[in-house]
Amino acid sequence: MKAAVDLKPTLTIIKTEKVDIDLFPSPDMECADVPLLTPSSKEMMSQALKATFSGFAKEQQRLGIPKDPQQWTETHVRDWVMWAVNEFSLKGVDFQKFCMNGAALCALGKECFLELRPDFVGDILWEHLEILQKEEAKPYPANGVNAAYPESRYTSDYFISYGIEHAQCVPPSEFSEPSFITESYQTLHPISSEELLSLKYENDYPSVILRDPVQTDSLQTDYFTIKQEVVTPDNMCMGRASRGKLGGQDSFESIESYDSCDRLTQSWSSQSSFQSLQRVPSYDSFDSEDYPAALPNHKPKGTFKDYVRDRADMNKDKPVIPAAALAGYTGSGPIQLWQFLLELLTDKSCQSFISWTGDGWEFKLSDPDEVARRWGKRKNKPKMNYEKLSRGLRYYYDKNIIHKTAGKRYVYRFVCDLQSLLGYTPEELHAMLDVKPDADE
């Protein structure tokens, strides 16, 4: 009987917690006075806000704002923020930080998004953005084509701030067969920066990649169709159709048979291609919201060096090549492993666990576990380790993007044309980072 009496005050406290008092600021309240959200209060806020967010539908209809945030222009993003500011009496919102289109906004990821806004404001805006994206998501039809998603989506060239990203792309749907990869740098074909900038995403769900007819005609290519079979971990190709395990590995999926496999898929030229740069596996989970829709060819003006030269938020305290800035420049959306490695390699504070060797684009993982830990933190994959990270690196071998240096442990080399893309020679980067050639060299 006593236990029942003790339980009543606890239940009463939970039931009488006021959402409008604890969670919503009054018009004259400064953002600094708003208490930090707890997991329980965030859940309550989520439930309370859903009803309020429904009012945005009228604003969308009035201003012609697309239902899918991925299709928003910079003007649509600004209108959305303005609506939220007026609806919730938000303060401390810097509209200049929203100078991007919807695709870039959605690609930021939650933590990066929240870093740009005051605590409470960021949670409200992110909650609404997630709801809008989930409402727009449609189940992928069995016959293969998702009409709700266009084949092309443009991304912003303003995507400059770097932070944690939750999205990750997947590798191409199928190789024709495994091939032997040489580790000799001298035997590689050159890879042009134009190939990197002609990247396409795999669409949500089953992977069917099509080139535009004009683009196809301009390349000497060989085509192949998707094989209806389960892919082994060796070739690191993953589908989007189902979640599963292969050979005891909890980080790979199987490819389901498709009804329509007679369509031409990803083309491969006689030389190595950067097409694969957008399709590094995310290893531990494949949630549908982690996959952006297909992007068009994106060819920015100038080099990455030109792109960031006058950016105010590029300073000595940040890496020379922030991964998110590089992702925005190339139009890749979510940060990829090769971009993340370049970020670490151009950050002086990371030289204790990853650094250039001083020999061109060669680099060494002095502490591979720390590199893997940071990659897992960036991608919100707590189970990430070097074994899983190395699978991603091995995937790059086949595309002549990164190769393992023979005879050296944890030593790799970028073998693609980074100089044309970045606008930096390796020697320039070494000088900026005070890199000294390894004594072993």
UniProtKB/Swiss-Prot annotation:
Tell me the compartments it is located in. Nucleus; Cytoplasm
Q: How is its activity regulated?
A: Autoinhibited by a module composed of four alpha helices (HI-1, HI-2, H4, and H5) that flank the DNA-binding ETS domain, reducing the affinity for DNA.
Q: Which cysteines are joined by disulfide bonds?
A: none
Q: Where is the PNT domain?
A: 51-136
Please provide, alphabetically and separated by semicolons, the GO molecular function terms listed in this UniProt record. Answer: DNA-binding transcription factor activity; sequence-specific DNA binding
Q: What does this protein do?
A: Transcription factor. Directly controls the expression of cytokine and chemokine genes in a wide variety of different cellular contexts.
For this protein, the record's PANTHER family field holds: ETS, PROTEIN C-ETS-1
- This protein is called Transforming protein p54/c-ets-1
The species is: Gallus gallus (Chicken)
What lineage does UniProt assign to this protein's organism?
Eukaryota, Metazoa, Chordata, Craniata, Vertebrata
Q: Which gene encodes it?
A: ETS1
